Amino acid sequence: MSLDLTQFVRNIPDFPIPGVQFKDITPLLGNAQAFDAAIEHFAQRYANQQLQAIVGIESRGFIFGAPLALRLGIGFVPIRKPGKLPAQTIGVDYSLEYGTNRLEIHNDALQAGDRVVVVDDLLATGGTVVAACDLLNQLGAEVVEAAFLIELTFLGGREKLGNRPFYAQIQY
């Protein structure tokens, strides 16, 4: 019998601003059985995909991406905010509702043709994961799928992803 992970996602009304229903995953992370179930679910999905790496988007993508990579026996590659990686990087700028942001990756993190899954905790508007996929394409990596614990369907992230494959364990 599989565990209902929605029981471990807490809804926080009016956080961080009035009108927002924040999905708090800390109860899931704090429960070893639930956290393991989430990682195992991803691992079963990607076990036979001939992946070279799991790529995690800063910061909560690291929480799910690193243990998934270990479970699959492959490497973990971080995509970070600007100025956080010590070696030579490539980056991509992307638009937010008010302004822009930037993601970076080490320029030697992957080889052309490497098959990867991009992991983050939540798919909202899709801007960050689209930028991450664009960054990986610059390195010549093949993004097999973008994986999320949660998708907030009402924010239109799946439309922003277009034809890029993605998967979410929980949808709201």
From Swiss-Prot:
It comes from the Bacteria. GO terms for molecular function: adenine binding; adenine phosphoribosyltransferase activity; AMP binding. InterPro entries: Ade_phspho_trans, PRibTrfase_dom, PRTase-like, UPRTase/APRTase. The keyword Glycosyltransferase applies. PANTHER family: ADENINE PHOSPHORIBOSYLTRANSFERASE. GO terms for biological process: adenine salvage; AMP salvage; purine ribonucleoside salvage. CDD domains: PRTases_typeI. Catalyzes a salvage reaction resulting in the formation of AMP, that is energically less costly than de novo synthesis. Keywords: Cytoplasm, Glycosyltransferase, Purine salvage, Transferase. Pathway: Purine metabolism; AMP biosynthesis via salvage pathway; AMP from adenine: step 1/1. Signal peptide: none annotated. Homodimer. It holds the Pfam family Pribosyltran. It is found in: Cytoplasm. It comes from Herpetosiphon aurantiacus (strain ATCC 23779 / DSM 785 / 114-95). NCBIfam families: apt, PRK02304.1-3, PRK02304.1-5. GO terms for cellular component: cytoplasm. Its EC number is 2.4.2.7. It catalyses: AMP + diphosphate = 5-phospho-alpha-D-ribose 1-diphosphate + adenine. Belongs to the purine/pyrimidine phosphoribosyltransferase family. This is Adenine phosphoribosyltransferase.
